[in-house]
Amino acid sequence: MSFEENYFKDRKYSAKEDLVSRHVMEVLKWASKTAHTDLLNGNGKRALDVGCALGYTSRVLSDLGYETIGFDISSWGAKQAKNNSCSQFLVCDAQVALPLALDSFDLVTCFDVLEHLACPEKAIRNMFDVSKGTVVCTTPNKKVERLIRKLLWDYDETHINVKTLAAWRKILAVTIGEGFILESFYDVAFRLGGRLFFKSIRIPTYGLTVRIVVKKQR
């Protein structure tokens, strides 16, 4: 499975920066409220963007004030991310031991990555280990993802590990024990007159996207 230049071009990823950025902000607002912590003020804090792709999330984090490091398994993606942002970017696999110090990041983000991984539980454990604060992830919901994405002509065959909320709860309980919350949402986005309209709607069980927030217990 390759996540190099052709993958991003086939997915028209370069045209999605404003959509990705809006999605990231909505999820961080939700996670801040849910975990009772201010993730929108990154001044004096460090953030890690797991699966940074072209660096759109990393740029949002940097704009919020975080000292940001991003990494991706794609060398091409990490190179583009470095060109798009002033953040630091690495090439590595989230499923293996990360070349980063334990308990060193106030915020770890992982947006729409877990579904691509053969062993997402290893990635979750690695993210938890390097975090000293909050881990925020999003991933498609198996209950509805294949049907809706095919109807929208947007299904990604590299989604090899799509799970339900119940399945993620079991994985998180085994992997990190406690301190996590999951909810499902459906994001509605459309353009009108050149302006992007974006609305997140919480739909229990059947939302298209599973949101995960983990607050590390000290």
PLM features: residue spans?
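Conserved N-terminal segment of class I S-adenosyl-L-methionine
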Residues: 1-102, 107, 111, 124, ...
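A short His-aromatic
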Residues: 112-116
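Helix-to-beta-strand junctions that scaffold the AdoMet/dcAdoMet cofactor pocket
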Residues: 117-118, 131-132
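Short N-terminal helix/helix-N-cap motif within the alpha/beta-hydrolase-1
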Residues: 118-122, 147
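Short, glycine-/aromatic-enriched active-site segment of Class I SAM-dependent methyltransferases
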Residues: 137-161
